Amino acid sequence: MIRKLFKTLLIILTLFLMLIGYLSYFGLTTSKFNSFIKDKIKKQNSDLDIDLKKVKLHLDLKNLSIKIKTKNPKIIIKNSEKIELNEISSNILLSSYFQEKFAIKNLLIESKKNEIKNYINFYKNINNSLEIILINQLIKQGKAQINIELNFDDSGKIKNDYKLSGKVLNAEIQVQKNKILKDLNFNFLVNDKNYKFEKILFKFNKINFNSEFLNIKQKNKKFHINGNLKNKKDKINNDIILSIFEDNLEIFDFSNTKFESTSEFNFDLSKKFRIKNLKIDTKLNLDELILKYDSNKIKNYIKNYNNLINLKQNKLHIKYSKEKILIDGSSKFYIDENFDNSINFQIEKIKNKIDFKTLLNLDKIKFSIEDIAYKKIRNQNATLQVKGFKNNKKLLFESIDYKEKNNNIVINNLEINNNKISNVDKIKFDFLSKNNFKNQINLIKKDDNYELVGKSFDSIQLIENISDSESDKNFFEIFENLNSNIKILVDEVKLDEKSTVNNLRAYLDIRNSKIFDLDLNSNFNENEKLFVSIKTQKDNSILTTFHSDRAKPFVKKYKF
């Protein structure tokens, strides 16, 4: 009897072990749970349904759990739209099940590629918020494949270690009115308060862009976002320019311009989609653009200027923040088609103040400054450095330094206000004129007055301008309400090709940018003198006295 009982128990144990082995290795396939699962979903939301195939059960001896898996299920929304899935799987803890606790340990869902609109409609049936309505309006089309990993605690709540991953394919998103991102593709990974996007590709205004990463991290009630954006060399269009710059850029011709860029950015985004603390670091290369600028001032110096400046190999490094904008740039520029020159510049904007530094290489430009008898020939090394700032209506050139071989022109603290000179601290001329005469003079400010001193100066233009105070060409009208005394001490002044005067001494009283008094003395030699006097009378009439022992240098130039 005992032997039979023992034999029976042994058979039962063997069968039980075989059953456990079978369940753990092969599993059990059934469809008995399908109606139960469908009923549970219907009770949660009557607009949702699920199409299940057979469910497979696997026994996990190591974790004392049962793994439930089903292949190719479909979630049906309002009997029409479908979300097709590759697999749904879950683990049920046996110990929790028998203790009547929440037994589901985890839930894994792997979808197929479905229309993004279907995912949105599914979510709307669960939580129809304003944000999801806005997202639905912005997304025009596209597909997505999504993987969901959820872990549950003993009370059935989702743990914070959830994971949402997948990829978006060929999406279209409206970013502005009539502006759409096309062919949008990216991979994504979402977990607790962190959103990561990688391998981002899209097309905007027919230009291909890509991004290696875009990270979003939730902090309290805001999101911190950082990422990068790139594009390979492609042809630019006006829509791109207008979307970046609000100013009128009609003076630029971008018709043949190709560009490439690399940008890194970070900012904070509130729940109301307000951007704060935006910072952008961009490197931008423009192969060619044309500046259309009609300027008579430029033509006064460069005779063959045709209102076009061709800019090539343009490189810009732009750093933007709310507090400051910094631009470093360089270009090759062409005024004559076959002769290139270069420019390097830095611009910094803080509030209403704009600081600038510029270095121009002018080797291959020929130009002249007629008022000071200066002429530069082509292929002669020359540089121009300019440093200053603009603040509201005030424009200050802290330093202007022009160098060409042994020639040098320096201007310090030249202040422009309302298109007129309101101040200048120093002007230095040290160059050989086009008449092969050395110009060596300095204009120096002392308190509110000036001294013009030097060894030599090749021009009578200064005397002509001073003497012409009653005409429309009054030299001092370029100044803003100038009220100063000017003392002039120049050893030698060239009047024309054959005449010079020595020891030119003058004293000027300037009031409201006009000559009030002038006394000028000089000599051709010991016996030949030059004297000019201008006196303003009490009735505001002007008495001018002129004497020269040589008439020839002045007969054609001086207006009696």
Where are the model-predicted features located?
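Short, cysteine-centered beta-strand-loop-beta hairpins and adjacent loop/turn segments enriched
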Residues: 73-82, 174-176
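Classical Sec-dependent N-terminal signal peptides that target proteins to the secretory pathway
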Residues: 3-22, 192
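Membrane-interface motif at the C-terminal end of an N-terminal transmembrane signal
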Residues: 16-34
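Extracellular/periplasmic ligand-binding regions of membrane signal-transduction receptors
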Residues: 65-75
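Membrane-proximal interfacial segments on either side of biological membranes
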Residues: 2-7, 30-66, 88-560
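A short, flexible beta-alpha/helix-coil linker loop
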Residues: 19-21, 76, 171
